[in-house]
């Protein structure tokens, strides 16, 4: 949702979003132009139907073979930003076969291929920017400005007392949340 809201700050932007059909209404409300049910539809084919020349940016939280799919959707001068490896997490337990399959199918491209295709690939991991205080502070300041102007607003799915951390985690593992799941310290409050 956060990435979608940031995309909305760009004038005349078209946003494709993949999610279960039950989450499509929330996606539309937050700025997704074309929600695609990845359970029933090949999102690559659907995007190519709507945007035959490709897309400018692919935000990839999945990794593995999906990074290659995203790369192949790019227009010339397009960019893939990979920021996660959700394909490694296939259920409540670690699955070594899924991990091996994702590693084996990971995207790889040479500098020459990037040059010839006029495309770019980059990664983002906030955890590795701990020494970049000035850079991160500047980004946070811009995000706060967008928030104060009403352009972005965190989407909170649910709030859980810390004692129910297992229930909150289960909700996320079962992909039932649309937005952030928050844990709050202190005892559960009576309604």
Give the predicted meaning of each segment.
Residues 8, 52, 74-75, 116, ...:
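Short conserved AdoMet
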Residues 32, 53-56, 165:
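Local beta-strand N-terminus motif with an aromatic residue
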Residues 42-53:
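Short amphipathic alpha-helix with an adjacent loop that forms part of the alpha/beta core around
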Residues 144-145, 149-159, 166-191:
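C-terminal capping/lid region of NAD(P)-dependent oxidoreductase domains
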Residues 12, 65-151, 186-191:
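Glycine-rich phosphate-binding loop and adjacent beta-alpha segment
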Residues 36, 56-59, 81:
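N-terminal Rossmann-like NAD(P) cofactor-binding module of classical short-chain dehydrogenase/reductase
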Residues 24, 44, 65-68, 166:
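Short, well-ordered alpha-helical microsegments
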Residues 1-41:
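Mid-domain Rossmann-like dinucleotide-binding core that forms the NAD(H)/NADP(H) cofactor-binding site
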